[in-house]
């Protein structure tokens, strides 16, 4: 009975009355151990009294049995006490370690969460600061010529297009009929129309420009300039460009050509994701500006303007095919169906070579059939410019170098076509013949009188 009471007391009290610390549990167990030892001494005293009574009653056999039983009970009690002690210490140690580990893990997790939140906040702040710095300091970091608005209008390309229109006017203008006002109108109108076309191009391709490393930093992509404002600005520039030329009746046709060229450029932009033939359609956009200048100079579509337009058209094919080969993977990732993406490199090289070879005899063919009295050096430079585009396929020059060669050869050819121009026979000779006829008629009339 006493043993069962001790075990019940241990099982009931156990960890319930202990504190959370290890030392508190040990103090409790020491007190409990002292109580259990007093119970054992009482059993011993009871054994002694009982043994004396038995000795007096001469019950030796029963006394021995009882003593053996009491000794066994003592052993059981001691064993149970030590087992409970070990289990009790294990429980205290496990609870203390688990509490400390849980507290440490919770502290670590809390610290990690705090650090992650701080890192996220820092990243958001850094991203906001970067966006603000991009929007505010883009002009400072890249310079004025490469600022957001200059990038939006593609200033280098716009200047290039304007120079081709100027070359068309200067090359086609008869000697003595050069007009600086008309040239200024053609230059400004072409410049504004080209700006409008480039803005429309970027506004249409915003979603695709994000996918290309070459165009991912454009102002409409990163949000430096609002798309709605850009669209309104492009319409305003187109209106100003057309009005600058159309205000003069003789320049209404060149102004109409400029406006139609903007519409063609927008249509070509959508075709870049539809068919590989977009390069040949887009080449018309680059061939029209010199025709604008020549029509402004002569008032009609003359042979010199057609030659410059055809030369520009042929020149653009190897030029843009070389660029598409350099940016093949970027075009593929953005979903553009360029010839370099849909066909092998050998096919692209053969197409470029065919156009370059066709451009060599082209100036002399025009001169033979139209006899527009262009300087032979100018014709030779046009042929050499086309030959330079064919040279890389013979010497195995990279497409990137071919692209650079095409950029160098074109302005040289246009400059010489303006510098080495000659008076046109169908202007000077016809005028002289009319004057001679008038003089002869006057002389004949005087003789009759």
From Swiss-Prot:
Residues spanning the membrane: 163-183, 245-267, 279-299, 303-323, 352-372, 374-394, 402-422
Record keywords, A-Z: Heme biosynthesis, Membrane, Mitochondrion, Transferase, Transit peptide, Transmembrane, Transmembrane helix
InterPro entries in UniProt: Protohaem_IX_farnesylTrfase, Protohaem_IX_farnesylTrfase_mt, UbiA_prenyltransferase, UbiA_sf
Stretches the record annotates as Disordered: 99-140
Compositionally biased residues, Low complexity: 99-138
GO biological process per UniProt: heme A biosynthetic process
UniProt superkingdom: Eukaryota
CDD domains: PT_UbiA_Cox10
Role summary: Converts protoheme IX and farnesyl diphosphate to heme O.
Protein name (Swiss-Prot/TrEMBL): Probable protoheme IX farnesyltransferase, mitochondrial
Source species of the chain: Dictyostelium discoideum
